[in-house]
Amino acid sequence: MEALIKEKLHEIEQRENCRILLAVESGSRAWGFASPDSDYDVRFIYVRPRESYLRLNRVRDVIELPIKGVLDINGWDVDKTLKLLHKSNPTVFEWFSSPIVYQTTDFTEAFKPVMRRYFSSKSGLWHYLQMAEGNYREYLRGDMVKAKKYFYVLRPILACRWILEKGTPPPMLFSELAASQLPDYLEKTVAKLLDLKMNSPEVKMIPRIDILNAYMDRSIAEVRALVEQYPREITKDWEELNALFLAALEM
């Protein structure tokens, strides 16, 4: 599959007249809890020729391929990426910390130290809190629930707790988050659920796990109360991001 993904990325570069600066796996495979039939969620950052950024009718700043089978591939222009980094968009931090990398360049190494300086704890907390709340409300209220949905609530909750404790971007791998933030009394329950999730189809239904639901209810309420008290953060300047953009145009 990796060879096919790299072939698709090369086709994108040829067809779109762009250069891919970074291509990674996102989603459950990068989080470390993929099911046997999980999609490959490939995400990439690209740059076009300088002239493309000097047009009155600007080219669209995303490239999206139709989903085919288990392949889901799309990417962002470096221009869009840097603007989102200025807002401390957590997705940017996730892509650049993915443990599964399909393609990279010198831009990635230049980007990472700058990226860390633009991290906002408050923005990260709101992002992961809203993700946890939405998935919990939508998928885990019934008597029977999809096993995989527990991890789409647990991971953002643990990410919030990581940010509250450390003030840094949370790691992609669920195992690293769990080792740091999951309460001891839930370890066996979550380990059993993780084994089930990774060895069952994506649609596997199980009875609701009340001990996990209680933890999620309590955690969501606690995080919301704390993030609402966070002070307004100072807006970062654009200087370093402008320099990165110009450097990307030369690659």
Residue ranges of each PLM-predicted region?
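Helical scaffold of the NTase/Pol beta-like nucleotidyltransferase catalytic core
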Residues: 1-24
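Conserved nucleotidyltransferase catalytic core and NTase-mimicking acidic/glycine-rich helix/loop elements
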Residues: 112-237
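Acidic, carboxylate-rich catalytic segments that either coordinate divalent cations
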Residues: 231-251
